[in-house]
From Swiss-Prot:
Disulfide bonds: none annotated. InterPro entries: PPase-energised_H-pump. Its cofactor is Mg(2+). GO terms for biological process: sodium ion transport. Keywords: Calcium, Cell inner membrane, Cell membrane, Ion transport, Magnesium, Membrane, Metal-binding, Potassium, Sodium, Sodium transport, Translocase, Transmembrane, Transmembrane helix, Transport. One of its GO terms (cellular component) is plasma membrane. Requires K(+) for maximal activity. This is Putative K(+)-stimulated pyrophosphate-energized sodium pump. The keyword DNA repair does not apply. Sodium pump that utilizes the energy of pyrophosphate hydrolysis as the driving force for Na(+) movement across the membrane. One of its GO terms (molecular function) is inorganic diphosphate phosphatase activity.
């Protein structure tokens, strides 16, 4: 059996698995596992409001995205035309790949959102019966996103590969692979708006709900009296399901494209389709490993949910390492040469394994810094005894400190992969890190589903036993979400470096001198970009949160009887505020990321652009890790105080709520969005590389 058949079979297997999980989740009918008619009616009402809000946002977001996709597709057609690829129009086929990537990413987001909003109420329903049943429903809901997205991504890439190579068998493979890179650009363009727009939406609602509800009115989280509570629950789906999904879809597509572009420059790989498609085989064989691992997802009534989820990550990592040994032995050529370096099949395999285990260790380190089972978060909780200021100081310190070990792990991965297999090894290491994406994304999507289930249980007043079960599920989801963010940032760093390597290969830039003014100027400018981007997204959350706070205060003042539960708040108004703010505020950060590499490359040339990419990568990775982990630390310090220390309502808890509110945009908007910044700038540079080689450096040409 050849690699093409296997890749298609595995992608179809993933899609079928997603369909099976969809049927499992939707087969549960609300109201069949206990409770009275009034409870069932409430459950369905709340679930419907969350679903409608989420889908309304997604539809409006996709309308805005479609305008950007159309603009970028036209730009690609106009600017790309490689004179070396006679008979093959680079611009048109890159644009086709670009639109395909964007479309598949949008479809994946839609499917994930649809099933998450169906799974949340069913998880709450299952929690009436048992913890084990509720866990399984939330996990199965996440699995639809995990397997569906990976299956569609791999199928999309292999179909485009077959179309391009089938239509143009005489054209050199590296030209075709460069056009295929458009697929990664499309996926990442959607991820940009999914992450930024979704992040602004979810945190505007969250901050508004917390500041007025918890701090001013002293009512608990997800209380139905809080006007922003539905918007808050909608935001969990918008940011953590659609946003995270699009982010990892982009990483998968971009790392694959980078490896294909670099690999296609080696004649031994170009001459063997099986060996050339090795990058796709890594993602493809991650699917059966993830399916086998998913059977282990079981918890008992008093079982440790967090351990059950972490076992998924560890077992899938070991399975992929074992499976890929035999895949490498069978499909990879014995040796090949790239840029004068001879690389063996085992150099490639070790690079993949190093990336794979590096991802796992980054997850372990992230857990240490963000879980309240360990010292760093408990120190933040302890610091809350002396007020919000010391809580914030300790939280910032935690974030900065937490970036040290992940960066060292990334350095070890990069150096090892580069020594063994050059730039190709770095791309393969990135693919190794995200080879378990199906199970990783399943666990990530599990988090917001169980969080929503808790919110629905609280609003529907299902009783303490049900809420205790959903709280346990949610607590585990919080820790695994932090691990997922660390994993996403690590994979973004390696993916971005792989794309940078492909860009250097593509533009024939053999060496870059740091002291060269063009390069150093680019480095400085690039290092500034993540901070500018973070400032823009932080302020956007702040502006949207101010609107939300004013609306919530207004409703408490103008609608009589909200606090007594006699009248319902106007939930829809808060949903509209979050939606409008997110769509309005995501435009400028989006333009910054998409247009910067095009303008820098055209005006200052390839060397300056290479400096910009390197600077943005180095500064962005450290900033993203510290922001995500500070936010995670503040969040779990608050939860630790609620469960183990001073308890809700204490001065210690009030200080921790302020820290948690400050941390919200850190961990759910700015931190994760930097992933997209570093990846999207790199893939944009790769796609437009030929244009920069031919037309770039306008400013220097004028002055020379």
């Amino acid at each position: 059996m050849n690699s093409v058949t296997i890749i298609i079979a595995m992608s179809i297997l993933a899609i079928v698995t997603a369909v099976v999980y969809t049927l499992k989740v939707t087969s549960i009918k609300v109201g069949t596992l206990g409770g009275n008619e009034k409870e069932t009616k409430k459950l369905l009402e709340i679930s419907s409001a969350i679903s409608e809000g989420a889908m309304a946002f997604l539809v409006r977001e996709y309308k805005v995205i479609s305008l950007f996709i159309a603009f970028m597709a036209v730009l690609i057609v106009l600017l790309l035309d490689n004179p070396g690829s006679e008979g093959f129009n680079d611009g048109i086929y890159t644009a086709i790949a670009f639109v395909s990537g964007a479309l598949i990413s949008c479809i994946s987001g839609f499917i994930g959102m649809k099933i998450a909003t169906a799974g949340n109420v069913r998880t709450a329903e299952a929690a009436k019966s048992s913890m084990a049943k509720a866990f399984r429903v939330a996990f199965d809901s996440g699995a639809v996103m995990g397997f569906g997205l990976v299956g569609l991504a791999i199928l999309g890439m292999i179909v485009l590969f077959l179309v391009f190579t089938g239509m143009y068998p005489g054209v050199e493979k590296h030209f075709l692979m460069e056009s295929l890179a458009g697929f990664g650009l499309g996926g990442s363009a959607v991820a940009l708006f999914g992450r930024v727009g979704g992040g602004i939406y979810t945190k505007a609602a969250d901050v508004g709900a917390d500041l007025v509800g918890k701090v001013e009115k002293g009512i608990p989280e997800d209380d139905p009296r809080n006007p922003a509570t539905i918007a808050d629950n909608v935001g969990d789906n918008v940011g953590d399901v659609a946003g995270m999904g699009a982010d990892l879809f982009g990483s998968c597509a971009e790392a694959t494209c980078a490896a294909l572009v670099i690999g296609a420059t080696a004649s031994a790989l170009s001459g063997s389709v099986d060996a050339l498609l090795y990058p796709l085989l890594i993602s493809a064989f991650g699917i059966p490993a993830s399916i086998l691992t998913s059977f282990l997802a079981r918890v008992k009534e008093d079982g440790n949910v967090e351990s059950a989820l972490k076992v998924q990550l560890w077992v899938s990592t070991l399975l992929v390492a074992g499976i890929m040994y035999f895949v490498t032995k069978t499909f990879m050529v014995d040796s090949f040469e790239i840029a004068g370096k001879t690389i063996t099949k085992w150099d490639v395999y070790i690079s993949m394994v190093v990336g794979l285990f590096s991802g796992m260790f980054i997850g372990i380190v992230t857990e240490y810094y963000t879980s309240h089972s360990y010292k760093p978060v408990r120190e933040v909780a302890e610091a809350s005894n002396t007020g919000a200021a010391t809580n914030i100081i300790y939280g910032l310190s935690l974030g900065y400190h937490s970036s040290v070990i992940p960066v060292i792990l990334l350095v070890i991965t990069i150096v090892t992969a580069n020594l063994l297999a050059g730039m190709y090894g770095i791309a393969i290491a990135a693919l190794g890190m995200i080879s378990t994406i199906a199970i990783g994304l399943t666990i990530d999507a599990y988090g917001p589903v169980s969080d929503n289930a808790g919110g629905i249980a609280e609003m529907a007043e299902l009783g303490k036993e049900v809420r205790d079960r959903t709280d346990t599920l949610d607590a585990a989801g919080n820790t695994t979400a932090a691990i997922g963010k660390g994993f996403a940032i690590g994979s973004a760093a390696l993916t971005s470096l792989a794309l940078f390597a492909a860009f250097i290969t593509r533009t024939h830039t053999t060496s870059l001198e740091v002291l060269n003014a063009e390069v150093f100027g680019g480095l400085m400018f690039g290092a500034m970009l993540p901070f500018l981007f973070t400032a823009m997204t932080m302020k956007s959350v702040g502006k949207a949160a101010v609107d939300m706070v004013e609306e919530v205060r207004k409703q408490f003042k103008e609608i009589p009887g909200i606090m007594e539960g006699k009248n319902k708040p106007d939930y829809k108004r808060c949903v509209d505020i979050s939606t409008s703010a997110a769509l309005r505020e995501m435009i400028l950060p989006g333009l910054l990321v998409l247009l910067t590499p095009i303008l820098v490359g055209y005006l200052f040339g390839v060397k300056t652009l290479a400096g910009v990419l390197a600077g943005a990568l180095v500064a962005g990775v450290v900033l993203a890790i510290s922001a995500a982990n500070s936010g995670g630390g503040w969040d779990n310090a608050k939860k630790y105080i609620e469960k183990k220390a001073g308890g809700k309502g204490s001065d210690q808890h009030k200080a921790a709520v302020v820290g948690d509110t400050v941390g919200d945009p850190f961990k759910d908007t700015s931190g994760p969005s930097i992933n997209i910044l570093i990846k999207l700038m790199a893939i944009t540079s790769l796609v437009f590389a030929e244009f920069f080689v031919q037309q770039g450096g306008l400013i220097f040409k004028i002055f020379h």
